[in-house]
């Protein structure tokens, strides 16, 4: 081998070593970045668990429970339970929960897409969210770390704040909000009534409750926004949500991954879960650690009973696999009903029949409007009907029911005409 060839080979080896070294360090950096990303995702997951545990601790406070009990018309709900035929196949305690759900949704709490203007008290298309406001000391005292800011087009852009309270006692006073406020207040009521209840958090931005049925020996889904009882596939098969993690929280029962109850664990769902936390074992360990911490002060007999119940629930969730007949039945579940059509549409929660949902509402509206307005065809009456119809749809988009919207639309337009 001549000297030049030796130098060339030496240079080639050196270049190859440098290339291999660069590749090695690049792989190390990529692994480190991946580890950092996984650690970051795990930290975010843990933060959500911590936050939910802080929320449920308030349900065990004696003052909070006393305030909650003072709000519930127990005797009246007992009477309704006895006279209701819709839930006659259920046991007494479960029937009471059904009546509590109806009362909570229709009489106690009020849904809020947008707050009423602080000046004119109107809400709807006049109110526009313009961002977030800085929470006041009072807001922070009642857990409102987020405060939405709205302005009213009818009042020279007058501004109104909407604090998102997370204090369950404060919510008994305000009685308004969205799914977070609904689930928080309703779970407190169940605990005050001595039901075993779990606060359930969905990682795609919804919250609801589960109640332990002594009569059925299982956890039952309760959504106080929809007055829905024992319809766990409502979100995946009704609303069309693509769920990932669904976790239930209770001071005694601990922290439980109940995702299988709410959506079939297929490949798509597994992929969505991995996008949140890559390591499923991490989730199992985290929920177990929190559960053990929450149960630490319980007597051994109670801990043993809960461990047995855990094992039964694990088996129940493992065996859940919807047959085609069950899937067909669940496809009849409705899309989301609470909130304005515009708001539900923006969240993609109208369900699998989203295209026909608006047509159905229009058909219902036409029936209501025909009963509310005149059917004669004079020009003046036709113009009046057009005005009332426009007002009707404005009110419907604010989440008001067809019958109420029709009555208010006719009244509003005639009032305006009377002032002209």
Model-predicted regions and their roles:
Residues 191-205:
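Short, well-structured beta-strand/strand-turn elements
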Residues 187:
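Cysteine-dependent deubiquitinase/ubiquitin-like isopeptidase catalytic cores across multiple families
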Residues 2-174, 178-181, 201, 216-420:
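Alpha-helical and coiled-coil interaction segments, frequently adjacent to or embedded
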Residues 209-214:
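Active-site beta-strand termini and strand-to-loop segments that position acidic
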Residues 105, 109, 190-195:
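Hydrophobic/aromatic-lined pockets within catalytic cores
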Residues 206-208, 229:
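Flexible loop/turn segments at secondary-structure boundaries
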């Amino acid at each position: 081998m001549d000297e030049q060839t030796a130098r060339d080979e030496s240079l080639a080896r050196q270049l190859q070593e440098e290339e291999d070294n660069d590749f090695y360090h690049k792989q190390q950096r990529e692994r480190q970045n991946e580890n950092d990303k996984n650690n970051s995702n795990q930290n975010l997951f843990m933060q959500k668990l911590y936050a939910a545990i802080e929320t449920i601790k308030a349900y065990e406070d004696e003052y909070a429970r006393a305030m909650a009990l003072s709000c519930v018309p127990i005797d009246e709900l007992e009477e309704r339970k006895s006279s209701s035929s819709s839930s006659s196949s259920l046991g007494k305690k479960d029937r009471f929960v059904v009546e509590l759900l109806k009362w909570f949704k229709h009489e106690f709490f009020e849904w809020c897409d947008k707050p009423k203007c602080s000046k004119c008290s109107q809400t709807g298309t006049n109110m526009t969210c313009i961002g977030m406001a800085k929470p006041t000391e009072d807001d922070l005292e009642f857990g409102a770390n987020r405060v939405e800011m709205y302005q009213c087009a009818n009042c020279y852009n007058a501004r109104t704040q909407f604090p998102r309270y997370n204090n369950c006692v404060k919510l008994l006073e305000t009685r308004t909000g969205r799914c977070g406020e609904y689930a928080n207040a309703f779970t407190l009521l169940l605990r005050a009534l001595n039901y075993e209840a779990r606060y359930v958090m969905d990682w795609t931005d919804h919250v609801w409750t589960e109640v332990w049925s002594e009569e059925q020996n299982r956890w039952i889904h309760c959504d106080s926004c929809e007055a829905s009882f024992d319809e766990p596939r409502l979100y995946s098969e009704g609303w069309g949500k693509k769920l990932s993690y669904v976790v239930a929280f209770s001071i005694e029962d601990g922290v439980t991954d109940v995702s299988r109850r709410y959506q079939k664990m297929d490949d798509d769902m597994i992929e969505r879960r991995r996008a949140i936390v890559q390591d499923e074992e991490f989730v199992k360990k985290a929920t177990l650690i929190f559960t053990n911490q929450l149960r630490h002060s319980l007597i051994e007999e109670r801990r043993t009973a809960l461990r047995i119940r855990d094992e039964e629930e694990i088996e129940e969730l493992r065996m859940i696999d919807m047959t085609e007949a069950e899937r067909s039945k669940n496809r009849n579940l409705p899309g989301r009903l609470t909130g304005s059509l515009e708001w539900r549409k923006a969240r993609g929660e109208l369900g699998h029949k989203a295209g026909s949902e608006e047509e159905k509402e229009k058909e219902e509206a036409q029936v209501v409007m025909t009963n509310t307005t005149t059917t004669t065809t004079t020009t003046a009456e036709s113009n009046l009907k057009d005005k009332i119809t426009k007002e009707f749809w404005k009110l419907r988009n604010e989440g008001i029911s067809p019958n109420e919207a029709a009555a208010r639309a006719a009244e509003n337009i005639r009032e305006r005409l009377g002032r002209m």
